[in-house]
Structures are given as C-alpha cells and as structure tokens.
Amino acid sequence: MKFLYGIVFIALFLTVMFATQTDGCGPCFTTDANMARKCRECCGGNGKCFGPQCLCNRE
C-alpha cells in the first residue's frame, strides 16, 4: 500500500512541477472574444488557447 501512495505522490508532484514551469499566463475563457489575442501577447507572440489553458510554445 505504501508503494501505491508513493506512486500517487510522485504523480502529483510531477503535475505541480509541470504546472509551475509554464509562463504564468491565465486561463482561456470562451466568454472573452479577445482571449486568443491575450494568450498570444502573454506568451510573447507564441501562445495558443488549448481548451481552458493558454499554452506557450517555446521555440
């Protein structure tokens, strides 16, 4: 059982680490018509809304 808790802890830890490595752009709301533009500007011209998340391409 401790092994299972360890796996869950590692998965949660990696998820939090991945989330904190993003550039800190806010979520994409479908109610805002300018959300795609705001996401691009936040990411320095390389952002794209993917579902509720603004993802920055690191090129």
Swiss-Prot record:
Keywords: Chloride channel impairing toxin, Disulfide bond, Ion channel impairing toxin, Knottin, Secreted, Signal, Toxin, Voltage-gated chloride channel impairing toxin. InterPro entries: Scorpion_toxin-like_sf, Scorpion_toxinS_Cl_inh. Expressed by the venom gland. The keyword Disulfide bond applies. PROSITE patterns: SHORT_SCORPION_CHLORIDE. Residues 1-24 form the signal peptide. GO terms for cellular component: extracellular region. The keyword Disulfide bond applies. Its main location: secreted. GO terms for molecular function: chloride channel regulator activity; toxin activity. Toxin with unknown function in healthy organisms. On glioma cells, interacts with chloride channels (probably ClC-3/CLCN3) and MMP2 at the surface of glioma cells. This complex is then internalized via caveolae, thus inhibiting the chloride channels necessary for cell shrinkage and tumor propagation. Belongs to the short scorpion toxin superfamily. Chloride channel inhibitor family. This is Chlorotoxin-like peptide Bm12-b. It comes from Olivierus martensii.
